[in-house]
Curated annotation (Swiss-Prot):
PANTHER family: 50S/60S RIBOSOMAL PROTEIN L16 (PTHR12220), LARGE RIBOSOMAL SUBUNIT PROTEIN UL16M (PTHR12220:SF13). This is Large ribosomal subunit protein uL16. Part of the 50S ribosomal subunit. Residues 1-13 have a biased composition (Basic residues). The lineage of its organism: Bacteria, Pseudomonadati, Pseudomonadota, Betaproteobacteria, Burkholderiales. GO terms for molecular function: rRNA binding; structural constituent of ribosome; tRNA binding. Residues 1-22 are annotated as: Disordered. One of its GO terms (cellular component) is cytosolic large ribosomal subunit.
Amino acid sequence: MLQPSRRKFRKEQKGRNTGIATRGANVSFGDFGLKATERGRLTARQIEAARRAISRHVKRGGRIWIRIFPDKPISQKPAEVRMGNGKGNPEYYVAEIQPGKVLYEINGVPEELAREAFTLAAAKLPLRCTFVSRQIGA
């Protein structure tokens, strides 16, 4: 499971996820990518589930890059606890996703196989995604 090894502060404020992705919006490592078209949050478990779906579909071929990392802690209070008495403990980590962000990349496989693998991965994620390929000269 992906999570930061060390943090300066354990807890973080909620914040607002606005704007579109300017960094990480192009396919830069592989030949094909899975790009988010909506904004949202991806938990470490969702990122791992999609990664497994991709790697199982392409079997031994290809190389996969995960372009996102869950670095934002989400805190929760235990069940049946009254309001107040401070903020809950960090329970899991999420990656905040803006539209246009490339989530996964792959190379070393045919386009049809990559498209099928990313379709399986997109089904595991709570946001709409699209298949993209590398721009020549970019």
